[in-house]
Amino acid sequence: MILLVFLVWFGVCIYICCNVPLLPSVHVCAYVWIIVFVFILIRTTPLEVFFVYLLFFVLPMWLLHRLAMDMI
């Protein structure tokens, strides 16, 4: 179940990252692929990978989004 949630979050965030023009978010797209694949290879439990994904992708994307909204 956690793996399914992780995959859904990953898909949604990759879609948003690559299609919504949030200035630096285009560069984050490659960054997230590297982070996720490295941690999938190193960490075997889906829960750890999910929390790493939240920390290193969802949180920075949320902060970028907040910054972009404050600039408008």
UniProtKB/Swiss-Prot annotation:
Protein name, please?
A: Probable protein E5
Species assigned in the record: Human papillomavirus 39
What UniProt keywords apply to this chain's record, in alphabetical order? Early protein
Taxonomic superkingdom: Viruses
Q: Which InterPro entries match?
A: Papilloma_E5_alpha
Family (UniProt): Belongs to the papillomaviridae E5 protein family.
